[in-house]
Amino acid sequence: MTDRIPALQAWYGGTFDPIHYGHLRAVEALAREVKLTQVTILPNNVPPHRPQPGASSLQRKAMVELAIAGHPLFRLDTRELQRATPSWTSETMVQLRLEAGPDAPLAFIIGQDSLLTLRTWHNYEALLACCHLLVCRRPGYPVEMKTDEDQRWLAPRLARHVDELHREPAGKIYLADTPLYPISATDIRARLASHQSCDDLLPPAVLAYIQRHALYRPA
């Protein structure tokens, strides 16, 4: 009798400034497609590739908690919020791999925009050695890599079937057929700053928190 392979575990990182329906609905669709039973949201404190968030780490943590309350798919991991140094995904996934052991299938969720620049990421090869990458489609971004060289690099790493993600511990890149959600945190912050409605873009509890704490208002 063989040991049962642990269930595929997935993490979803970002600034979540603020968390919105574009984040949540894309991951819900991905979970159905890839057969995930749980996704861990991993907010970062010091994003290495973008400006500092408009909301504090505690405020962003609170908004994530409000957004996922009562939703069994999601849980929260605050380890990156506790760092004062840049949140390198590869370092976090190395730590998670050590915690999970060598055989558990692990995955990190990214958008198509991130896949296009993946080979510029800090220690991206170590990242793929630790986990699979699950790629959600993003509006306005091509499905092909930027160069022929990058496309040749990608081809042998692509997972052709969901079962590969559950059988193997790491190393595959899965291009999910998730719906396109034309929602971005940048647009939401701009709408909030100009007092436009965001009722259909954010969970009500998150919007109420933003209004209560006067977040994303012009200086």
Swiss-Prot record:
Look up the domain of life of the source: Bacteria
Q: What protein does this entry describe?
A: Probable nicotinate-nucleotide adenylyltransferase
Query: Which keywords does this chain's UniProt record carry?
Result: ATP-binding, NAD, Nucleotide-binding, Nucleotidyltransferase, Pyridine nucleotide biosynthesis, Transferase
List the NCBIfam families.
Answer: cyt_tran_rel, nicotinate (nicotinamide) nucleotide adenylyltransferase, PRK00071.1-1
What gene does the UniProt entry assign to this protein? nadD
Function, please? Catalyzes the reversible adenylation of nicotinate mononucleotide (NaMN) to nicotinic acid adenine dinucleotide (NaAD).
Report the pathway entry.
Cofactor biosynthesis; NAD(+) biosynthesis; deamido-NAD(+) from nicotinate D-ribonucleotide: step 1/1
Q: Matching PANTHER family, A to Z? A: NICOTINATE-NUCLEOTIDE ADENYLYLTRANSFERASE-RELATED, PHOSPHOPANTETHEINE ADENYLYLTRANSFERASE
Q: Which CDD domains match?
A: NMNAT
Reaction equations catalysed: nicotinate beta-D-ribonucleotide + ATP + H(+) = deamido-NAD(+) + diphosphate
> One biological process GO term for this chain?
NAD biosynthetic process
Annotated organism of origin: Cronobacter sakazakii (strain ATCC BAA-894) (Enterobacter sakazakii)
Coiled-coil residue spans: none
Which Pfam family is one of this chain's hits? CTP_transf_like
Q: What Enzyme Commission number(s) appear in the record?
A: 2.7.7.18
Q: Which family does it belong to?
A: Belongs to the NadD family.
Q: Does NAD show up as a keyword for this record? A: yes
UniProt GO MF annotations: ATP binding; nicotinate-nucleotide adenylyltransferase activity
- InterPro entries (UniProt xref): Cyt_trans-like, NadD/NMNAT, Rossmann-like_a/b/a_fold
